[in-house]
Amino acid sequence: MQQLTQKLGSGEMVIQEVPYPQLGKGMIIVKNHYSIISTGTEGSTVTAARKSLLGKAKERPQQVKQVIDTLKKQGPIQTYRAVMKKLDAYSPLGYSCSGEVVEVGEGVTEFVVGDKVACAGAGYANHAEIVSVPVNLCVKLNIEANLKDAAYNTLGAISMQGVRQADLRIGESCVIIGLGLLGQLAAQILKASGVTVIGVDVSEAAVNKSVENNSIDLGFFRDTDGIENKIQNITKGHGADAVIIAAATNSLDPINFAGAVARKKGKVVVLGAVPTGFQRDPFWYKKELELKMACSYGPGRYDLNYEEKGIDYPLPYVRWTEKRNMEAFQNLIVTKKINIGYLTTHEFEFENANAAFNLVVSRSEPFTGIALKYNTVKAPSKSKISTSKSENLGKINISFIGAGSYAQGNLLPYIPKTSDVGRIGILTNSGTTSKRVSEKFNFQFCATKENDILDDKTNTVFIATRHDSHGSYVLKSLKANKNVFVEKPMCLLESELNDIIKEQKKTGKTVMVGFNRRFSPLTKKLKKAMGNNPMTMLYRINAGAIPSNNWIQDSEIGGGRVIGEVCHFIDYLTFMNGSIPIKISASAIPDAYNLNDTLNILVQFKNGSSGVIAYYANGSKSMACLLYTSDAADDRV
């Protein structure tokens, strides 16, 4: 199937043939009919990507800081690889679309094949022929819904959340600063709710368009003389009950202007990307104004449990989640309480998406909403995609399931480039990643399904996915009679471990876990010097903090840091003393999120050795990450 992508390094935009998306649990696969270009968010992303490296650095100072931090922690080589990986990658674009359901995943009950739906979410609702989207980022549409209008789903939900943050009542007034897509959508939602809407924009054309299409009650060009007094008069001398800033600018004018036109104890809601360093006097302090932010589509946004796992918030306690915001927006469209049609000033066939984005970047003519239309008659290919002319097979023929940052930095570059090793297939959740990795590392194809990887060509499978899928992929690979290399941990559940042991004994195939530290040259020297005599050992890891909402900390997906990472150090101590553990005890310090990732572990071994693993998530960044000592060693590592 085809997908629009952009390379961050050069800004090049390409419609690529990429693998058909995988259907995960709690997800649906949708054939797109329309997708909408966010001329603000996507426009700035595309524009920044086309700048020089210096221009990119100026545009994204926070990412420059991340690079510097990585350099301090991991050194120049790993930092260079990480930066180049990012710059060389083709990233998907798009986050708002509509279409019809063509497949339904496990556990999905609210959608069936053939349903009309609207979808949201960067990385999900892409500009692509086919998308795979979690259920809480999709809404079912009325059978009579206009799919072009419905494709404004994400933008509508963002505007809706801004309106909800303003918390206005019938008869109250609101000034909207910025009459682009978000501003005009928010204005229509407010008008449908009985609120008097006053629109302000730096573009007279935007103001005129909003007035002509009845999106606002009154409109003003920002440079209109005496604009503050005019708004005071309209609001009977009080000022607006709320101001919604839907502009995108580096100027402080919107936030200070909002203070000037809001009433005493009024609200200012920031919906767009603007700085908030307002002047305290003469308005903000004396009026005791309330500044509120609108977080994207609404409650549930950026929450892994809500968006990826599909765990809803109870309606009596969280009335308007991001999904319910989308549903409310779609209801306003289908009941004709708001008018979306006039917002679409340009429509391009998907094949001409480059021209659409060139219009956004160059601004060669006025535009508001830009829709991409898809060929829904053509059936997208589900076949694997060839990425190399070579079909050579070696003694060892490798395929990868999962090829994210770790695999690209620490596994794939070190596969021997000899005739004994054949590079067969790549399978990842992201079609763009599969394609790029397969091409970069000279694999024969990128896959669309597991069976492509577990075919007769492959005899060795590398598994580098998220931790929760390790166990099942190891088991499937063994049952397909493959040797397996799996990144740590091998699995998360004891039941999975038992099944793997049973299957390995049955097939006799090799299963290797990525405990790479035992193979380092220095470790080999230490091992040779110390032998297998009983010893006391200390392994201190200054691991650093990982946020509680990171997938690694999720007990179901990452398993937590003890299962996910500390297993590595237990293996190291086991290797160093040449004996297996017989007793383990641990003690963690309390933390607010019950992560238990700052702890001491005491391990006793069969040969009488003992080891302490001191794993600290709260250590100083200035301290070395790793320290290994032993009474049998002369030096520290």
Label each region the model flagged.
Residues G123, N146-T224:
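Mid-domain Rossmann-like dinucleotide-binding core that forms the NAD(H)/NADP(H) cofactor-binding site
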Residues Y628-D635:
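Conserved small/polar residues in nucleotide/adenosyl-binding loops
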Residues M1-P92, T335, G369-K384, D634:
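Short N-terminal strand-loop motif that marks the start
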Residues A379-F441:
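N-terminal Rossmann-like dinucleotide-binding module
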